[in-house]
């Protein structure tokens, strides 16, 4: 019995009013709700994401729907850490 990880896609749903947040639970996992900016962050299965986005766009209380850009981002920061260390070393050398 092996644990299989399902790929998930984050979806940002901008609303006119937050009264319908409970209704969004049927489309996916409500991860975060911003009361001030009136948006909800949902997680859905990656293979079902396009269909869910189309269904959400048709709802009258939804202003707009956008996909999360996180899967497209490079999450390897090792090269950036080395670059920061080099810059710190050069600044220290210049001060001396």
From Swiss-Prot:
GO terms for cellular component: cytoplasm. The keyword Cytoplasm applies. InterPro entries: DUF2129 (IPR016979). Pfam families: DUF2129 (PF09902). It comes from the Bacteria. Keywords: Cytoplasm. Its main location: cytoplasm. Belongs to the UPF0298 family. This is UPF0298 protein LCA_1075. It comes from Latilactobacillus sakei subsp. sakei (strain 23K) (Lactobacillus sakei subsp. sakei).
């Amino acid at each position: 019995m092996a644990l299989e990880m399902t790929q998930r896609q984050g979806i940002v749903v901008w609303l006119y009013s937050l009264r319908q947040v409970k209704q969004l639970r049927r489309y996916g996992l409500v991860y975060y709700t911003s009361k001030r900016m009136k948006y909800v962050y949902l997680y859905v299965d990656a293979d079902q994401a396009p269909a869910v986005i189309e269904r959400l766009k048709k709802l009258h209380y939804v202003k707009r729907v956008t996909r999360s850009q996180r899967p497209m981002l490079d999450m390897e920061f090792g090269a950036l850490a080395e670059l920061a260390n080099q810059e710190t070393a050069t600044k220290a050398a210049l001060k001396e």
